[in-house]
């Protein structure tokens, strides 16, 4: 499994195999996620301790002046267990690619897309769950979903001009009143028990997020109509779409896919790093996740799919809905020559087509192949990369996840673009909270990198070159 694959190098192949078999046996025999974690964590603590004792002084990489001024881009400085972003392959969740997750993770009865519950189980344990384990998780989240009255009152009294992401962040912060970790910490709980309380808070928060998000949507766009009640027989995504007011089974399938693929993207992006940083101060999961959502609300992180839709709409307005390849090329070149970018193309790390784009494209080809906006997106996919390569400036001319997601949401009637980042946030909770559990389990300390002033950096460089 992903947590133990390197054990052979430290403990010997035979002992490592025993650990893997023991973990798999625990996974197969229990539907209680916390029980499985209680079995896995001591083994991983031992593995990490041995690794650090043997290789703690090993140099991982060099830091350049450009890295320090350039947003620490490419700097290796975090341990993040749940996912790894490969420039050529895209994201891998505990070693599994998106196509593998689509194939292996359990699905709803009659459905074709993976259930986010299965992805969360994978992120936490490193194991593909059984249908029974996923069903347990769906029911567990349904049990924990109710919102406290003060949060409901708060959401119902927000002004309608308050951005949905501001409402989400504020409501999650207010849920901190329910934190079992915060209460236990104030009472002096032993640090070896931290992960157990972080687990409980994380499970509660994930369970409540669809209720919070749906209430925001109904208050802003559906005249404050009721979100209804959680159905314990339905999965997490299905309950979410019901509360939003959507009854189309295809939209529920899209939501399962969307919430799965947006869940995690290794640890260096703004929302993941923020939750990791704030959590390292032993802020509870509610405060850590609220901080992450404030980062996600920034236009450089969570608003890209809105920018794509605005650009596509403007394109259609200027050149028409049924545009030739030649006219489309001219429009793209005009966009680039005016100093603007083509939204939805390029990525800070990826150097190939984002597999999150590809799986959304496959969904559209299956369910909405004749939709005019999808046809335009598909047409751009044929044309834009070659133009960007010809221009010679882009390191990655290929589309990313944001080039497609907004078009799919629009097709099923969710046209409120300001709300899209809330969906992103609900999904991202799966990844960052899974990691937060492991950060406390492995005893990660307060994050405190060293900063330097420009003058200090110049003196340092002079001393090196002199």
Curated annotation (Swiss-Prot):
**Matches recorded under Pfam families:** Citrate_synt (PF00285)
- What protein name does the entry list? Citrate synthase, mitochondrial
Under the GO molecular function aspect, what terms does this record hold?
citrate (Si)-synthase activity; identical protein binding
Keyword Ubl conjugation recorded: yes
Where are residues bearing N6-acetyllysine located in the sequence?
Answer: 76, 321, 327, 375, 382, 393, 459
Query: Can you tell me which family this protein belongs to?
Result: Belongs to the citrate synthase family.
Which sequence positions carry the modification called N6,N6,N6-trimethyllysine? 395
Spell out which residues are annotated as carrying Phosphoserine. Answer: 226
Q: Its principal location?
A: mitochondrion
Q: What else is known?
A: Citrate synthase is found in nearly all cells capable of oxidative metabolism.
What residue intervals hold the motif SIFI-degron? 2-21
Q: Quote the pathway field.
A: Carbohydrate metabolism; tricarboxylic acid cycle; isocitrate from oxaloacetate: step 1/2
Q: Which residues form a coiled coil?
A: none
- What is the recorded post-translational modification? Methylated. Trimethylation at Lys-395 by CSKMT decreases citrate synthase activity.
Q: Which organism is it from?
A: Bos taurus
Q: Which domain of life is it from?
A: Eukaryota
Subunit details? Homodimer.
């Amino acid at each position: 499994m992903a947590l133990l694959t390197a054990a052979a190098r430290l403990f010997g192949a035979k002992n490592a195999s025993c650990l893997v078999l023991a973990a798999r046996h625990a996974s197969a025999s229990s539907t209680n996620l916390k029980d499985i974690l209680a079995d896995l964590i001591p083994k991983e603590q031992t593995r990490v301790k041995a690794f650090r004792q043997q290789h703690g002084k090993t140099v991982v990489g060099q830091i350049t002046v450009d890295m320090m001024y350039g947003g620490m881009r490419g700097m290796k400085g975090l341990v993040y267990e749940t996912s790894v972003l490969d420039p050529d392959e895209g994201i891998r969740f505990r070693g599994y690619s998106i196509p593998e997750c689509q194939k292996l993770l359990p699905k709803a009865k009659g459905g074709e897309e993976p259930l986010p519950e299965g992805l969360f189980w994978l992120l936490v344990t490193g194991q593909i769950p059984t249908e029974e384990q996923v069903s347990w998780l769906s029911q567990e989240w349904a049990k924990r979903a109710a919102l406290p009255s003060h949060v409901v009152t708060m959401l119902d009294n927000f002004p309608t001009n308050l951005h949905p992401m501001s409402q989400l962040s504020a409501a999650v912060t207010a849920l901190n009143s329910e934190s079992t970790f915060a209460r236990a910490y104030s009472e002096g709980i032993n640090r070896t028990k931290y992960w157990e309380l972080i687990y409980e808070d994380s499970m509660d928060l994930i369970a409540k997020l669809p209720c919070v998000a749906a209430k925001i949507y109904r208050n802003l766009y559906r005249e404050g109509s009721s979100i209804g009640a959680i159905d314990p027989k339905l999965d997490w995504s299905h309950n979410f779409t019901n509360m939003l007011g959507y009854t189309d089974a295809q939209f529920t399938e899209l939501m399962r896919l969307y919430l799965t693929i947006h869940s995690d993207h290794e640890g260096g992006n703004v929302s993941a790093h923020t939750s990791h940083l704030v959590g390292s101060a032993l802020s509870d999961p509610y405060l850590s996740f609220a901080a992450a959502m404030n980062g996600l609300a920034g236009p450089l992180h969570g608003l890209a799919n809105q920018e794509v839709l605005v650009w596509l709409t403007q394109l259609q307005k200027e050149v028409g809905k049924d545009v030739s390849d030649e006219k489309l090329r001219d429009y793209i070149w005009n966009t680039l020559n005016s100093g603007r970018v083509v939204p939805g193309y390029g990525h800070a790390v990826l150097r190939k087509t984002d597999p999150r784009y590809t799986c959304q494209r496959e969904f559209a080809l299956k369910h909405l192949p004749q939709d005019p906006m999808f046809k335009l997106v598909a047409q751009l996919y044929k044309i834009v990369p070659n133009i960007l390569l010809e221009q010679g400036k882009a390191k990655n001319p290929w589309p990313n996840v944001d080039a497609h997601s907004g078009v799919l949401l629009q097709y099923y009637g969710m046209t409120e673009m300001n709300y899209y980042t809330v969906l992103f946030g609900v999904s991202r909770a799966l990844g960052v909270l899974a990691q937060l559990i492991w950060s406390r389990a492995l005893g990660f300390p307060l994050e405190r990198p060293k900063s330097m002033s420009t003058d200090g950096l110049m003196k340092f460089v002079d001393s090196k070159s002199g």
